[in-house]
From Swiss-Prot:
Protein's name in the database: Dual-specificity RNA methyltransferase RlmN
Gene3D superfamilies, A to Z: 1.10.150.530, Aldolase class I
All residue ranges annotated as the Radical SAM core domain in the record: 111-350
GO molecular function list: 4 iron, 4 sulfur cluster binding; metal ion binding; rRNA (adenine(2503)-C2-)-methyltransferase activity; rRNA binding; tRNA (adenine(37)-C2)-methyltransferase activity; tRNA binding
Gene for this chain: rlmN
UniProt family annotation: Belongs to the radical SAM superfamily. RlmN family.
Organism: Escherichia coli O17:K52:H18 (strain UMN026 / ExPEC)
Record keywords: 4Fe-4S, Cytoplasm, Disulfide bond, Iron, Iron-sulfur, Metal-binding, Methyltransferase, rRNA processing, S-adenosyl-L-methionine, Transferase, tRNA processing
Cleavable signal peptide: none
Length: 384
């Protein structure tokens, strides 16, 4: 994947300027040092960028005019633009965001006491999970740091400007949009660092969640890079079913995946000792009571809570949505084993913003050999 990778070290724009949204605080301080400035100037600019969603150096009134002029010559603050907005009857908002000549989708989900932003990490996805709309679009490229944190920046600016409507500020971010975050570690981790940074968005590490389908070598590496909440897209109680609906399982099976999860939990404080298990409910595929018993046995040594997700259909999908009665029976079996089990409330399905429905506008550049490599052969973390 190295030909598609954009790293934080290569952040100049087409006009030769540095997009400051591509830099975490350490990189920002190095940039200001190269300008002959003190590190605290970087902190001041970051505060303007993220606390006030400011992208105009002239509005940064505690920065002297000479430095503002210098910044305008060599840098910019450019977040990707929203090109389409859809609002659900339940208050969910989906934004289509332009990244070059393509689009990714970002979803804002307000609740009584919080508001969650679902953020994309790639243009498309190469993992080919059979129940997910994004996977059917193919894969084009990784998003760069500015395109990931820029989704949060853009959403915060929109929500902040609309306080009179009662919309809540963003309290949680979930890396559960388009793409597999662990296949874009070089850009996802710096973006999450900005989310956590007090001069960035200042979110608690327990309120930033990364979801993965099981790229085990990258998960091993993640624990040494950053501490955030972890959710895993399990979706099956055994390898036979998971091989079919989550093809990466053919390389990194459930036992290997869960072992890596337990290792991450040993390093992490953000998870409070347990991982979130995501389990999409597919009618008569993985939703029987026998599957629930298998799942309980599978997870007996993995501290977790379980989110059961009613499947959200999309055109051409080969599955059906589990009935409420089947979901209820499945949930009761898990609870009888003592598992905290939640049936996720579907949000935004009337605008195709629910789990598994994000599609965007993707020019598929995924080569057949690349898909095979990602599903069935070792993944080189240096190229992730």
């Amino acid at each position: 994947m190295s030909e598609q990778l954009v790293t934080p070290e290569n952040v100049t724009t087409k006009d030769g300027k540095i997009n400051l949204l591509d830099l975490n605080r350490q990189q920002m301080r190095e940039f200001f040092k190269d300008l002959g400035e003190k590190p605290f100037r970087a902190d001041q600019v970051m505060k303007w960028m993220y606390h006030y969603c400011c992208d105009n150096f002239d509005e940064m009134t505690d920065i002297n005019k000479v430095l503002r002029g210098k910044l305008k010559e060599v840098a910019e603050i450019r977040a990707p633009e929203v090109v389409e907005e859809q609002r659900s009857s339940d208050g969910t908002i989906k934004w289509a965001i332009a990244v070059g000549d393509q689009r990714v989708e970002t979803v804002y989900i307000p609740e009584d006491d919080r508001a969650t932003l679902c953020v994309s990490s790639q243009v498309g996805c190469a993992l080919e999970c059979k129940f997910c709309s994004t996977a059917q679009q193919g894969f084009n490229r990784n998003l760069r740091v500015s395109e990931i944190i820029g989704q949060v920046w853009r959403a915060a600016k929109i929500v902040g400007a609309a306080k009179v409507t009662g919309q809540r500020p963003i309290t949680n971010v979930v890396m559960m949009g388009m793409g597999e975050p662990l296949l874009n570690l070089n850009n996802v981790v710096p973006a999450m660092e900005i989310m956590l940074d007090d001069f960035g968005f200042g979110l608690s590490k327990r309120r930033v969640t990364l979801s993965t389908s099981g790229v085990v070598p990258a998960l091993d590496k993640l624990g040494d890079m950053i501490d955030v909440a972890l959710a895993i897209s399990l979706h099956a109680p055994n390898d036979e079913i998971r091989d079919e609906i989550v093809p990466i399982n053919k390389k990194y099976n459930i036992e290997t995946f869960l072992a890596a999860v337990r290792c991450y939990l040993e390093k992490s404080n953000a998870n409070q000792g347990r991982v979130t298990i995501e389990y999409v409910m597919l009618d008569h595929v993985n939703d029987g009571t026998e599957h629930a018993h298998q799942l309980a046995e599978l997870l007996k040594d993995t501290p977790c809570k379980i989110n059961l997700i009613p499947w959200n259909p999309f055109p051409g999908a080969p599955y059906g949505r589990s009935s409420n009665s089947r979901i209820d029976r499945f949930s009761k079996v898990l609870m009888s084993y003592g598992f905290t089990t939640i049936v996720r409330k579907t949000r935004g399905d009337d605008i195709d913003a629910a789990c598994g429905q994000l599609a965007g506008d993707v020019i598929d550049r995924t080569k057949r050999t690349l898909r095979k490599r990602m599903q069935g052969e070792a993944i080189d973390i240096k190229a992730v």
